[in-house]
Regions:
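N-terminal hydrophobic/helix-forming segments and targeting peptides
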Residues: 1-333
Length: 333
């Protein structure tokens, strides 16, 4: 399964090598020409008839991660978060992969053994460590290096019509775009799998500048709010609703006429979709729209429960609707 293989790849910001290699192998298998730029973006060019607009489809490869910054005398690893979406609550007692393939467990001292009384400080990353079962600092440094990345290790599981996996926020988009290239119509368009989304969308900045698209369509995940305790302030997002289109997100307000036009086109084509008022994360389309002379932007999102957490849950039918929407855009532009 394509999504399973992508979720099992490690892809810290700036360390997307595994994801990039897998995507490059898939592009070669389907015969799609591509290049890798100086920042590590994979840029694919689908051949075909030129359309009315130059379209760029975008998905990011990286995921929230950790970086090893110190080793204690007893061999425990100290770390810091890479990106803004890593929380100590997500990491507690999680299995992680450090460096090439060193397994470890995130731990912290039991509360009753801490001198700290403040609850927030107790839960901070400063009081967490990674245990790789090394007996000393010297033994630990034989297996890892300062500066190595670590990512949470969580198995991919099919749960009936749903799937659970790690790094869903990025790998859902990569999967959808690869499926588009597999089944694409006879139209010319470009695709970019970007690096370093989690640390400021650095890969998208370069790709949008060099490709100069008329329309940028990014594809990622949106947190589903169909869970206990969700306030649903921006409207309910549920698994099984199909592909979502954002009017606004944390970084951009999308042209209403563009969103409404594609929402109408989806309805006419029988594609299950809905417009959401607000998405909590800044999508790449909005960022790319500001490069050079600007571009039209559309943010497509697949509902997923806890997409940026170590384990997200999505519905297969939503991914299928997203792929159908990408194909529709490629055909009509």
């Amino acid at each position: 399964m394509l999504l399973k293989a992508l979720c099992e790849c490690s892809g810290a910001p700036g360390g997307e090598k595994e994801v990039r290699q897998y995507i490059a192998a898939e592009l070669e298998r389907i015969g799609c020409p591509y290049e890798i730029d100086n920042l590590g973006n994979v840029i694919a060019h689908h051949p075909g008839k030129s359309g009315k607009q130059k379209v760029l489809f975008a998905a990011h490869m990286d995921e929230p991660a950790l970086m090893i910054c110190d080793v204690t005398e007893r061999g425990f690893l100290r770390f810091k978060a890479v990106g803004t979406r890593v929380t100590p609550r997500q990491l507690s007692s999680r299995t992680v992969r450090v460096g090439e393939n060193v397994m470890g467990v995130v731990g912290f001292a039991p509360y009753h053994m801490m001198r700290i009384t403040d609850e927030q400080k107790r839960r901070s990353a400063e009081n967490q460590h990674i245990d790789i079962a090394a007996e000393s600092k010297e033994r630990a440094l034989e297996r890892i290096q300062i500066g190595d990345y670590a990512v949470v290790d969580s198995p991919f599981i099919e749960m009936g019509e749903n799937c659970k996996g790690r790094a869903m926020d990025s790998r859902l988009g990569c999967c959808a775009v690869l499926e588009l290239l597999r089944e694409a119509p006879d139209k010319a368009f470009d695709v970019v799998f970007t690096t370093m989304y989690e640390v400021g969308q650095r890969g998208m900045e370069v790709a949008a500048y060099t490709q100069q698209p008329d329309l940028v369509v990014s594809i990622g995940a949106v947190p589903a709010t169909d869970i206990p305790g969700s306030l649903n302030k921006e409207g309910r997002v549920e698994l099984g609703q199909g592909v979502c289109m954002a009017l606004t997100d944390a970084g951009f307000a999308y042209p209403r006429n563009t969103v409404e036009a594609w929402s109408k086109a989806a309805k006419e084509a029988g594609i299950k979709s809905r417009v959401v008022q607000y998405a909590p994360d800044a999508a790449q389309a909005g960022y790319a729209a500001l490069c050079r002379n600007g571009a039209l932007a559309l943010s497509l999102l697949i509902p997923c429960r806890t997409p940026a957490a170590p384990a997200g849950i999505m519905k297969k039918s939503d991914l299928n609707e997203a792929v159908a929407m990408l194909k529709l855009i490629a055909e009509k532009c």
